[in-house]
């Protein structure tokens, strides 16, 4: 893993957080307990704070960044899919951000939300708890069912277990 201090500010990682070797975590970043940052991810806290909550997973190829005065806050047990771009936004607990989605500065995603694959959440847009959010520009199309919300929770739990599997068994052979 590549963990970088920048301007005297080093990332703060809980001992149970797992960061893949090819991921980069830079500057003013906090990773809470049971977080996982997967291969090829960049979490760059150079202009403002980035906080990633307990049990959250940031999947392969994603980029997390913030602008000055616009921190990035990700709640607990959030699943951030492959190649997601999060920039200066707020993501509520137990939400799922689908593959390739983009969430821009000042946007707020409520708790228990599903942002569909490829969605573009524009600057300052806010969505209430339990929303299914799709499209470009993104719109809330309906509320999630209790079964769908449980599926979001299962995804986060799976990645906590998968990170433990990688911590215990990943061995570089070449």
Task: Tell me what each language-model feature is.
Residues 1-13, 18, 46-49, 54, ...:
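Glycine-rich hexapeptide-repeat left-handed beta-helix
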Residues 34-35, 52:
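Short Gly/aromatic-enriched secondary-structure transition segments
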Residues 23:
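Compact, Lys/Arg-rich rRNA/RNP-binding cores from ribosome-related proteins
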Residues 26-32:
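N-terminal glycine-rich anion-binding loops that anchor highly charged ligand groups
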């Amino acid at each position: 893993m590549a963990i970088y201090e920048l301007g005297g500010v080093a990332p703060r990682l809980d001992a149970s957080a797992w960061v893949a070797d090819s991921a980069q975590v830079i500057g003013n970043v906090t990773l809470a307990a049971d977080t996982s940052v997967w291969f090829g991810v960049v979490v760059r806290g150079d202009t403002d704070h980035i906080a990633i909550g307990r049990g959250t997973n940031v999947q392969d190829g994603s980029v997390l960044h913030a602008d000055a005065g616009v921190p990035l806050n990700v709640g607990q047990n959030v699943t951030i899919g492959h190649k997601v771009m999060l920039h200066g936004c707020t993501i509520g607990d137990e939400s799922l951000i689908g593959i390739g989605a983009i969430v821009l500065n000042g946007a707020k995603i409520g708790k228990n939300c599903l942002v569909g694959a490829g969605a573009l959440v524009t600057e300052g847009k806010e969505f209430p708890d339990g929303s299914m959010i799709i499209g470009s520009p993104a719109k809330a199309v309906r509320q999630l069912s209790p079964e769908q919300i449980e599926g979001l929770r299962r995804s986060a739990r799976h990645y906590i277990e998968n990170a433990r599997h990688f911590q215990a068994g990943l061995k570089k052979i070449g």
